[in-house]
Every structure is written in C-alpha cells, then in structure tokens.
Amino acid sequence: MPSISTNITLAFTIALTGMLVFRSHLMSSLLCLEGMMLAMFILSILFIMNLHYTVSFIMPILLLVLAACEAAIGLALLVMVSNTYGLDHIQNLNLLQC
C-alpha cells in the first residue's frame, strides 16, 4: 500500500511542478490542475479505505464535484479568452476586466 500512495503523491508533485513550469498557457494550467485534483481524489479514497472511516465517504465525492465546477469555469474562461484574443495566454485574463 505505501507504494500506491507514494506514486499518487509523486503524480500530485509532478502536476504541481507542471503547473509552475507551464503557467503561461491557460490550457496547460487547467490540465495540471485537473491532474492535481485527481491525485487528491485518489489519495482521499485511499486514506478513507485504510482507516475504515466510512462516515466520510462523501468527502471524495464533494472534491470531485468541486473539480468539475473548477473545470467548467476554467473552460468557460478559456473559450472567452481564445474567442476575444485568439490566444490562451494567462496574461490575457487581466484584459477581460470591466
């Protein structure tokens, strides 16, 4: 079991590193953020299953719902920025202010 949690933690760390390295493009940042949320989802499932703490089975599902909302808002921003400016650079998000 420690090897699975180590691999998932490594996947989270790689996604976090990708978020820091590829922070200029919105699509790359969204993909790295989704990888981080998926790793957190799997780690929370493993944590709950190891402790046999069945009361908190709702927490990973809540995390998945929040990840879906984050993805929807991120994709809406991506479509708005790419339709307005033709690029998906994060610096263009500052130009969308009223």
UniProtKB/Swiss-Prot annotation:
It is a multi-pass membrane protein. One of its GO terms (biological process) is ATP synthesis coupled electron transport. Pfam families: Oxidored_q2. Its EC number is 7.1.1.2. It comes from the Eukaryota. It is an enzyme of class 7 (translocase). It is found in: Mitochondrion inner membrane. Its main location: mitochondrion. It catalyses: a ubiquinone + NADH + 5 H(+)(in) = a ubiquinol + NAD(+) + 4 H(+)(out). GO terms for molecular function: NADH dehydrogenase (ubiquinone) activity. Keywords: Electron transport, Membrane, Mitochondrion, Mitochondrion inner membrane, NAD, Respiratory chain, Translocase, Transmembrane, Transmembrane helix, Transport, Ubiquinone. GO terms for cellular component: mitochondrial inner membrane; respiratory chain complex I. Core subunit of respiratory chain NADH dehydrogenase (Complex I) which is composed of 45 different subunits. Belongs to the complex I subunit 4L family. Core subunit of the mitochondrial membrane respiratory chain NADH dehydrogenase (Complex I) which catalyzes electron transfer from NADH through the respiratory chain, using ubiquinone as an electron acceptor. Part of the enzyme membrane arm which is embedded in the lipid bilayer and involved in proton translocation. This is NADH-ubiquinone oxidoreductase chain 4L. It comes from Lepilemur sahamalazensis (Sahamalaza sportive lemur).
